Regions:
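Feature of Fe-S/electron-transfer and energy-metabolism proteins
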Residues: 1-147
Length: 147
């Protein structure tokens, strides 16, 4: 699994770097891929951690690629969006990702109301929001960011 921490300015201000540092300390063996992204576009829910599965797989609720779930830059399915995470949550976030069992972080998942509200939006200027590592120019160029 892959954990992607939203480290736009609001995510950083809300403590995303502290949470990521705590997870990385637990992840000394590299069992979980850890990354960052810029703005995810939901400031009021920060810090946010997106949990992705392996590329080419689908969440249990999807029968096919036509299921319409959000995917990461490499085609990974978004399995969970954890919101308002805190440093005290780092151990269970890490354990959930390392084991592949997300039941221990269900209380951190985005609410059905917030999810429904956000799914109605069509992002145009922010269409790659939450998918680009702000420290990797190649990630930006891969989505025609410099075109």
């Amino acid at each position: 699994m892959k954990l992607v921490f939203g480290e736009g300015s609001c995510g950083i201000a809300a403590g995303a770097r502290k949470v990521r540092a705590a997870v990385e300390k637990l992840n000394a063996d590299g069992a979980v891929e850890v990354g960052i992204t810029g703005c995810i576009g939901m400031c009021y829910l920060e810090p946010i951690v997106d949990v992705y599965g392996e590329p080419g797989t689908y969440p249990p609720s999807e029968a096919s690629a036509e299921g319409g779930s959000m995917r990461g830059g490499n085609g990974e399915p978004l399995l969970a969006r954890l919101v308002r995470v805190q440093e005290k949550d780092a151990e269970r976030i890490y354990k959930a990702a390392a084991s592949g069992d997300l039941s221990g972080v269900k209380d951190l998942e985005i609410s059905a109301d917030d999810k429904e509200f956000l799914e109605k939006q069509t992002r145009i200027a922010l269409r790659h929001c939450g998918l680009i590592d702000p420290e990797d120019i190649a990630a930006y160029e891969a989505v025609d960011g410099s075109a």
